[in-house]
Curated annotation (Swiss-Prot):
Name the record gives this protein: Aspartyl/glutamyl-tRNA(Asn/Gln) amidotransferase subunit B
Subunit architecture: Heterotrimer of A, B and C subunits.
HAMAP family, A to Z: GatB
SMART domains xref list: GatB_Yqey
EC number per UniProt: 6.3.5.-
InterPro entries assigned: Asn/Gln-tRNA_amidoTrfase_suB/E, Asn/Gln-tRNA_Trfase_suB/E_cat, Asn/Gln_amidotransferase, Asn/Gln_tRNA_amidoTrase-B-like, GatB, GatB_C_1, GatB_Yqey_C_2, Gln-tRNA_amidoTrfase_suB_CS
Amino acid sequence: MNNLESWEAVIGLETHVQLNTKSKIFTSASTAFGDAPNTHIDPVVCGLPGTLPVLNETVLEYAVKTSLALNLNVAEHCKFDRKQYFYPDLPKNYQISQFDEPLAENGWLEVEIIEKDKDPYTKKIGIERLHMEEDAGKLVHSGSDRLAGSKYSLVDYNRAGIALCEIVSKPDIRTGREAAEYASEIRRTVRYLGVSDGNMQEGSLRCDVNISVRKGPNAPFGTKVEIKNMNSFSAIQKACDYEIARQIEVYENGGEIFQETRLWDEAKQLTKSMRLKEGSSDYRYFPDPDLGPIEITKAQKEIWFNELPELPSKKRNKYVNEFGLSAYDARVISDEINMANFFEETVANGAEAKLASNWVTSDIVGYLKANKLSFSELKLSPENLAEMINMILKNTISGKIAKEILPELIKKNISPKKLVEEKGLAMISDSSSILPIINELINEYPNEVQAFRNGKTKLLGFFIGQLMKRTKGKADPKLANKLLAEKLNG
């Protein structure tokens, strides 16, 4: 068994965020996903002779906003470079990227690490740089769409030329969990900004992980290995954990780690060697002669900074410190901007924050999951949820009735007050309506009444159940308990 505690992992992430612009980074070709192969291409995408790229201004705006949200220093001057390598999915045999003068450098992101049976903690992870580049095409392999065993491969260039932001972290990450949480916070941030949908299954957010291990925090860095092919946050965590253990085992058995690229095999839950890793000199970078330098004024940066929304970390702090929510509930609500906005509007309409949180994170999220809906598809208005919550507090309806009417409120988005009136679901909260039913029960169940009076006080629950059954759950529970106890103690 490996002595994991005597080793320290050193992890950095390269995160590729696909920007959701309508057209590609250097041409007007569409970025639509899921259409027939090679329908969103043009001479610029294919690199035909005589074509010239022109930077999409929205790409620059989205990239700067992402940089500012990640606390990066945005350069006043940057440029594009050609990254040269041969692969079938690269139509020009070079990729337009940024090398020595990236858009932004030296930022950071705080992430919350919550693990079962461990104390939660917050970690500040440095970000080396953010640069803009174009995406490559996609190889489609025959058979199972895997290279191994396929008879031929086809190339779909629909993705080629789509705008990417590559976000490179500093080697500040130490565990697979931290790596997964960092990637998750990146996705949360770009979704809040509206610059990307961050869909890992569609390739809108892709992460490559660089991992090495060393003997303690003061030892020099070991040889790093790059891991690819992780399409979920859980895969990132599992791939990191596996690779850390693999490298430690190699070292402890007297072996050597090579600088290589490995693929995560989800089915086998292990990493497999793909190729030796190239260095930057292998790409022969040089400035792209077809694209001029980019100048970004302080005034323009200030305009874009002022357009940033309240980001997830600030919302979490606000929910805990101002709204009194638990750290867990604050995390769940802030995970999606539509949920966060809905929750805040519900509170603004008079609902108590903790009650609003319970309804949003439990009942509403449960309904949406059961019906395979996203929060953006929710028809229920914050005003109507706040009204329903306050009806419970005023004893107009019970919590049980509220849960029963919630699906209809979500489907129709009608006033809870109106729905309760139409269905006759208002809580019975006057003694004169409840006492006759209690008297009926006492007359019908004399043996149970005598048993209660002889000390079997748990029978109170039996009578409460019978009362609720006859009132169809509409009797005020507190009043019902009080009146029943008085009668039974007779």
